[in-house]
Amino acid sequence: MEKLNTGLDSNSRKAVADALNGVLADTYVLYQKTHAYHWNVTGPQFHTLHVMFEEQYREMWAALDEIAERVRAIGHFAPASGKAFADLAAIDSADAKPPAAAQMIKNLLEGHETLIRRAREALDIAGEANDAASEDLLTVRIQTHEKTAWMLRSMTE
């Protein structure tokens, strides 16, 4: 942990960093799952899902950097190994064998909903710490994952 004089006390920064690292881990696992599904999707909806999954994993890839850099900006370190991400994540990693396309959609929907809940918890922690920058980042993450969840949910109806 670095010494900072930015108006956030060290305990608050630690709590926010821990919460952000949880969101980061879930984002990383969901990114990997989405990317694997992009590679392995088959069936009549192949092209639609292949393109959609690519848009989703590219968006999450960019978000990973933003979240990790926020953790660094408040004086803490981001997880740096697959094991660390797996230990922190609430989302299950990609399946050993690719599921059918319909199950991929359901699995991703569940992952996005889990991530939304996790980001809301982190948002509350950032709010208690008066960390407006982390609140802004988390608000955008919630909005993005809610929109993606809506689109995935619409494909299951």
Describe the function of each predicted region:
Residues L8-A15, L30-E55, A122-A133:
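Helix-loop segments that flank and shape redox-cofactor active sites
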Residues L24, Y31, H38, Y57, ...:
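A structural signal for well-ordered alpha-helices, especially hydrophobic packing surfaces
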Residues E2-V23, A101:
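Disorder-to-helix initiation segments
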